[in-house]
């Protein structure tokens, strides 16, 4: 509904009506009365057009007009309006929202009610139905069909299934509803045709009393059929709203499950499900160790219970700190990935822009070369050519400079990585040299009795220098000089016999 124009939509069977001109004092009874009056006006116009058509093709004195065809399904204009045949007290407006419905009292301010729904207005529908096709109470109810029993022939089998329509297919239900519409339209046409004839007849009172009973029977049948049609269409609206609500709930459930899954992946890793199962299996295996006796298990439980609570609190605090650091690490990792993606995207955009500019400049340069030179250009033409040449050289230099800058950054990153690898190898080599020196001091004899501390001080430094010189010699020598193995480590160790006398002499 548009609040500026004060309009509201009301469904009548399968047709949507827009009621305009509403005010804050408009009630549901006013809307029902307006809709019934509109239906009466439309029926009068249809009857008038039918009479004008029948006047052009008159029937015989005892000939009745042809009944409507049973297979005619295109009479959509007359069907909804032909069913509104009764006083306003026989109709009511039902409010439907997400599969629930309630009967609106006649004194309800419908415009105020519509404004109170707020954001849920798109899920609310107002349906005009007969009062017999809805529940007597005004509370909300779910989509449960009600069976309207016949007053002439009550149902003999009370124990019959309450919902035989559930076993029917959708196409069969559609055919039943269409047949009910056609039958209702046929009864309405017969009643409209018999009304003028009954007013102009001058038969006796006995004949009029005999003809009134079938007319009453037909009117009751029309009312029951109209009630049934309104009930079916009301349930159709309710079912459609429930199906829409189910789709919305499915989308919300999928969104929540995806959010929970991503949260768990962020906290516990990608394979958190597999890790959970493995942890559970490990606990079960630990709990069912075959070689452990119940007494030992009880003793371990008592020791765990007798442990001081401070250890448990410290462990819990350590776990919390570890979890916090893990969360921080994950957050930093995500930020790093985002920054890398942004950097790659910007680099690709810059490269694409440079390529486009280069190609544009190149095309302009080729086009300028292909154009013939004007003989009367004079110094202006030469100046333009010189300016174009300088601009082309400048763009070329800019492009080449940017490419060289990119290559320089790549070389710098490779150089930093190589420097880091060299530092790590250097530290590893120094650690190996220190370990080897310690082993040599352990294996060597304790030394001469007259040796003192000043004579032992230059020993490690001299050994370290010697091993560095040997390592440099191995690095300079090719792989063909290594006779023991391919790595060269065995040749390094093969020089132990040469280095031991020097160490011993220094000691």
Swiss-Prot record:
One of its GO terms (biological process) is nervous system development. Pfam families: RASSF8-10_RA. Residues 4-133 form the Ras-associating domain. Its main location: cytoplasm. Residues 197-213, 447-460 have a biased composition (Low complexity). PROSITE patterns: RA (PS50200). Residues 46-80, 185-222, 444-507 are annotated as: Disordered. This is Ras association domain-containing protein 10. The lineage of its organism: Eukaryota, Metazoa, Chordata, Craniata, Vertebrata.
């Amino acid at each position: 509904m548009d609040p500026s124009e004060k309009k509201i939509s009301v469904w009548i069977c399968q047709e949507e009506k827009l009621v305009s001109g509403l005010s804050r004092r408009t009630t549901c009874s006013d809307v029902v009365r307006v809709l019934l009056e509109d239906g009466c006006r439309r029926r009068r116009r249809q009857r008038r057009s039918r009479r004008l058509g029948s006047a052009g093709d008159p029937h015989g004195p005892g000939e009745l007009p042809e009944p409507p065809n049973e297979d005619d399904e295109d009479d959509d204009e007359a069907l909804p309006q032909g069913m509104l045949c009764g006083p306003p007290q026989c109709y009511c407006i039902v409010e439907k929202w997400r599969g629930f419905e309630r009967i609106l009292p006649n004194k309800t301010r419908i415009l105020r009610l519509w404004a109170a729904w707020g954001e849920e207005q798109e899920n609310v529908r107002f349906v005009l139905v007969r009062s017999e096709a809805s529940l007597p109470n005004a509370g909300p109810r779910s989509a449960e069909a009600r069976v309207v029993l016949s007053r002439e022939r009550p149902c003999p089998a009370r124990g019959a299934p309450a919902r035989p329509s559930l076993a029917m297919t959708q196409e069969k239900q559609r055919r039943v509803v269409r047949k009910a519409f056609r039958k209702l339209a046929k009864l309405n046409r017969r009643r409209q045709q018999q009304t003028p004839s009954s007013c102009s007849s001058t038969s006796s009172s006995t004949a009029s009393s005999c003809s009134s009973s079938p007319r009453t029977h037909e009117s009751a049948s029309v009312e029951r059929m109209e009630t049934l049609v309104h009930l079916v269409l009301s349930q159709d609206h309710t079912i459609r709203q429930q199906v829409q609500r189910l789709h919305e709930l499915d989308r919300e459930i999928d969104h929540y499950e995806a959010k929970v899954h991503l949260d768990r992946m962020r906290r516990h890793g990608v394979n958190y499900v597999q890790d959970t199962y493995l942890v559970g299996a490990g606990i079960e295996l630990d709990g069912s160790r075959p070689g452990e006796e119940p007494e030992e298990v009880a003793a371990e439980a008592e020791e765990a219970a007798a442990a001081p609570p401070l250890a448990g609190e410290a462990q819990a605090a350590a776990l919390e700190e570890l979890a916090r650091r893990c969360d921080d690490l994950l957050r930093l990792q995500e930020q790093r990935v985002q920054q890398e993606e942004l950097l790659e995207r910007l680099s690709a955009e810059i490269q694409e822009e440079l390529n486009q500019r280069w190609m544009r400049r190149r095309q302009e340069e080729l086009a300028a070369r292909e154009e013939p030179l004007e003989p009367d250009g004079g110094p202006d033409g030469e100046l333009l050519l010189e300016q174009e040449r300088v601009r082309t050289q400048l763009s070329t230099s800019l492009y080449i400079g940017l490419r060289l800058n990119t290559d320089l950054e790549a070389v710098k990153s490779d150089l930093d990585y190589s420097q880091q690898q060299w530092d790590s190898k250097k530290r590893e080599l120094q650690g190996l040299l220190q370990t080897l020196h310690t082993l040599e001091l352990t294996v060597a004899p304790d030394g001469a009795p007259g040796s003192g501390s000043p004579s032992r001080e230059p020993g490690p430094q001299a050994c370290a220098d010697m091993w560095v010189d040997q390592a440099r010699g191995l690095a300079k020598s090719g792989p063909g000089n290594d006779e023991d193995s391919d790595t060269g480590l065995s040749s390094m160790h093969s020089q132990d016999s040469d280095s031991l006398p020097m160490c011993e002499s220094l000691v």
